[in-house]
């Protein structure tokens, strides 16, 4: 990590607050710390579809199925979404630490995650408001073919307070798009169970 470059990019990130290119500068700065291959920034709301704030990767497969598979309901099975759903504390989380036992055999992994080619992923979970969390996810995929080192994880962990401040300042007033009049979470879960298991549930169930 080049300390001077990191500080310079942090300054540029601060200058970009409230501007359209904020997420781009945030990503560039974080890359000097974690040297990640891909970035996904998502806003999760209560009972609504997540909103993509940034999707950046040189490996096409990472985000290829995000819009029509992940946002179509599979996100409900994402261990990171469960952190939102359970109101987890603001922190830096690693997928391999929070994923359920036999993660490589479960539905989320088989139907979506393995196709992204991501082999390691960490996420800053930030709460700009009680109803919304923003997840800044940094991943390693087949491009580098390696997991994050202890040093990289430590560097990312150290800047958590800065990331939290930046995210809350920039996206503190973000609201769910009123243009989406589709299913809510309950309706989406009923449909997902029906499609994957052939079981017809009612909303009451």
Regions found by a protein language model. Give the residues of each.
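Short alpha-helical interdomain "coupling" segment at the junction between an upstream regulatory sensor module
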Residues: 167-184
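Short, structured helix-loop boundary elements
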Residues: 3, 153, 183-187
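Regulatory input/activation interfaces that engage signals or partners
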Residues: 5-17, 21-142, 155, 161-171
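Helix-turn-helix DNA-binding segment
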Residues: 182-205
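Non-catalytic regulatory/interaction regions at protein termini and inter-domain linkers
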Residues: 1-4, 198
